[in-house]
A protein has these predicted regions:
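Terminal regions of secretory-pathway proteins
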Residues: 1-197
Length: 197
């Protein structure tokens, strides 16, 4: 996930990028609902909330099924049944999770859930969150965060080489050099095919 190498979380990275550039595409997400509107599959927000959410309803569950059911109850606003799990210590009994009264505050990062870690949203790992982001209509095959980082990297690679190429082509007329250079000439220079004319 990159934590051991010091890679920031998705929202912390977006905060840093936005502070450096002011670029709207990397503006940090303000709530779980905001994040849900910018991922490929909006219902995936249930899995993100189950994994990273800090609502008491989620943290009170001991099993993955329980955490996911709690996230479903928060997102959908419908009671969810959790199956029994006798293998847990202590065993988990079958139970029903009802939607909490503050679920909309949690999803919108308002009320008691405003600020701070935004209900766990600021803990979403860069790699997982970045892969889940929707592909921009005119932005390549990556989500907005990874697309910005990729473009930034490519531009800096090109900038590093730009003076080399400028000095090598100074005084050349590109059209005059391209016109007599036929494809067969290129093949003859780079292979042992001989005369192709």
């Amino acid at each position: 996930r990159g934590r051991e190498t010091g890679i920031p979380t998705l929202n912390h990275a977006r905060t840093e990028l936005y502070a450096m550039t002011g670029h709207v595409d990397v503006k940090p997400y303000t709530s779980w609902l905001d994040f849900a509107q910018h991922i490929k599959n909006p219902i995936s927000i249930v899995n993100f909330i189950a994994a990273y959410g800090t609502h008491d309803l989620i943290e009170g569950e001991a099993t993955l099924a329980g955490k996911r059911a709690a996230a479903m109850a928060i997102v959908l606003g419908v009671a969810q049944d959790v199956p029994a799990n006798p293998d847990m210590v202590p065993p988990v009994l079958a139970h029903t999770i009802n939607p909490p009264p503050d679920r909309l505050d949690f999803l919108n990062a308002t009320g008691l859930h405003a600020g701070g870690e935004l209900g766990g949203l600021n803990q979403v790992d860069m790699w997982i969150g970045g892969l889940a982001e929707e592909i921009n209509e005119f932005g390549g095959m990556l989500g907005s965060t990874f697309n910005y980082i990729f473009e930034y990297q490519m531009e800096h690679l090109q900038n590093g080489d730009r003076f080399y190429y400028l000095s090598r082509t100074q005084g050349m007329n590109l059209l005059n050099l391209l016109e007599p250079n036929m494809f067969s000439d290129i093949i003859m220079r780079n292979t042992d095919l001989g005369d192709l004319h």
